[in-house]
Design a protein with these regions (language model features):
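Zn2+-dependent metallopeptidase catalytic domains
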Residues: 10-114
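Bacterial N-terminal signal peptides
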Residues: 1-6
């Protein structure tokens, strides 16, 4: 039993790098948050930023999933399950911000986006 666990840990768990779409870094939701504790730059974010950011983040997630699905290496727990769990970081960041604000400080415009 211990041997099989060790063997699984030695498997090649690498995933080819995804070909991510070009991001519009002028959108504050897509750019790095160089703020204390990497908090969102609320003063720079406008409602019009959300839809293009969601579209770009979904495209990134699809590219990351495509890289996992089309990995020529033998599937392992690491290069399949763990990789799927780790993909979508940008989408999670944008959705987390949007849906928290939607609950805390909603507006008709935000409801339309949701």
């Amino acid at each position: 039993m211990a041997f099989s666990a060790m063997a699984a840990g030695c498997a090649d768990n690498s995933v080819p790098k995804a070909q991510l779409p070009e991001l519009d870094l002028s959108n504050p939701l897509l750019a790095a948050w160089n703020t204390p504790h990497e908090t969102p730059p609320f003063s720079e974010i406008e409602l019009a930023d959300y839809e293009p950011a969601f579209d770009a983040a979904i495209a990134c997630s699809r590219a990351e999933i495509d890289a996992i699905v089309n990995n020529p290496k033998k599937p392992t727990f690491g290069n399949t399950i763990v990789a799927l769990e780790r993909q979508g970081e940008l989408l999670n960041r944008i959705a987390g911000l949007f849906f928290n604000l939607l609950e805390a400080d909603t507006s008709d415009e935000m409801q339309e986006i949701a």
